[in-house]
Each structure stands twice: as C-alpha cells, then as structure tokens.
Amino acid sequence: MQHKSPVVTWDLFGLDIKFNLASILMVIITSLIVLVIAIACTRNLQKRPTGKQNFIEWVFDFVRGIIESNLAWKKGGQFHFLTVTLILFIFVGNMLGLPFAIVIDHTLWWKSPTADATVTLTLATMVILLTHYYGIKMRGTKNYFKNYGQPFLALTPVNIFEEFTNTLTLGLRLYGNIYAGEILIGLLSSLIIGHAAWGWIIGVPGLIAWQAFSIFIGTIQAYIFIMLSMVYMSHKIADDH
C-alpha cells in the first residue's frame, strides 16, 4: 500500500522549500534515543566496568580501531566523539523503521530517518564539509588546495568532481539500502494482512528472515558510513595525500 508523506512547503524568497515532517520527527527521536543511551551508559562510571558501561566502552574501542586504521591517533583522536555519535545515530536510525510503521490517515509518520535521501545526503554533506574544514585547518590553505592538482595539474577538474561523487555515494548508499529494506518489509506485511492462510504461511517466515537480514544490513551500513568518513578525512589531513 502506498502512503503519502507529511510534507509542508515554505515559500522562501520565491523558492518552494519542502520539509518532510516525518523525517524531522524521526531525526529528533533518533537524537533523543542516542542522548538517552549516552547518559544511561556513562552514569556512575566504575573502574571495573559492567553492563551498560561495558557496552559504551566497547563502542568507543571499536570506533577507535576504525579511526586508527586510517589515521595516526595523534591526528585522528579529535574525531573520536564525532565518529561515535555518527555510528550511534545511524545505527539507531536504521533500526527504528524495522519493528513497525505508524500510518495515520494514509500518512506515514514512523519510519527510519535514514530511509529519506535528504537526511542521508545531509549527513554526507556534513561529513565532507568537515573534511574540508579540518584539511585547511591542519594543512594550511595553500597546501590543502595544492593537493587538488596532484598528481597532475590537468586532473584538477577530476579531483574537484570527485568531491561531489563522494558526497552522493556516501549518502545514497545508506539511503538506498535502508529504503529498499523498508519497502520489502512493507510488501511482506501487506501480504500477511491482505491474504488468507497462505499469506501468513509465506509472509511471516519471510518477514522474520528479512527483519533479521535488515538488522545486519543496517549495522553494516552504519559501519561503512563511518569507515568511509574516516577514509575521506585521512585523505584531506594526511600530508602524504
């Protein structure tokens, strides 16, 4: 079944700017969940971690490993909290649309925020802009822009164009995987609801299997996003690139 999105349009200096209220709502909910996780896992920290503290320390160690695979910790350590926040936000966002969807008057309100290309491309743009900022900050303006003429000056347009393709692929890869997963979950749910016993026989096992696979895909996509983010960051701030 097709559902419409709660989109509002604002007229800004003659331009129609559209906002998906469901995506905004889900971004806020995702951010609040990440905030609650962070607060819950870092309260009453102990020298011998247990339970929730073990989990958050594992996340920090896991992310540190990703950073160190691309950058020396002396340079990459400053991105530790940023990368932890990103992986938690993307992972939680990927998971929110899996258990259920909330539809009111044929309008879809509850979904994964990362199933919206605007959200994922915004995240990707933010990351790419940060790579430029830190590249200039840590290498200097002259050395940073000189890098676009490497290895040959004639390749400058290609290197500039690559920045746009990196942004698109980083954002659309995440969006495509999560959106496709939610579409298939919706189709399987419709099969269960709209048909008799055979719909349950086919749909329920398929839905359970696809839910499990979607959890795996959502986890992998969160990992890929931050891994590529650190790869792009290393290309901008490393002296040998």
Curated annotation (Swiss-Prot):
GO biological processes: proton motive force-driven plasma membrane ATP synthesis
Subcellular location: Cell membrane
UniProt keyword annotation of RNA-binding present: no
N-terminal signal peptide: none
Membrane-spanning segments: 21-41, 84-104, 116-136, 183-203, 207-227
One Pfam family named in its UniProt record: ATP-synt_A
Keywords: ATP synthesis, Cell membrane, CF(0), Hydrogen ion transport, Ion transport, Membrane, Transmembrane, Transmembrane helix, Transport
Record's subunit section: F-type ATPases have 2 components, CF(1) - the catalytic core - and CF(0) - the membrane proton channel. CF(1) has five subunits: alpha(3), beta(3), gamma(1), delta(1), epsilon(1). CF(0) has three main subunits: a(1), b(2) and c(9-12). The alpha and beta chains form an alternating ring which encloses part of the gamma chain. CF(1) is attached to CF(0) by a central stalk formed by the gamma and epsilon chains, while a peripheral stalk is formed by the delta and b chains.
Job description of the protein: Key component of the proton channel; it plays a direct role in the translocation of protons across the membrane.
Protein's UniProt name: ATP synthase subunit a
Source organism of this protein record: Staphylococcus carnosus (strain TM300)
This protein's encoding gene: atpB
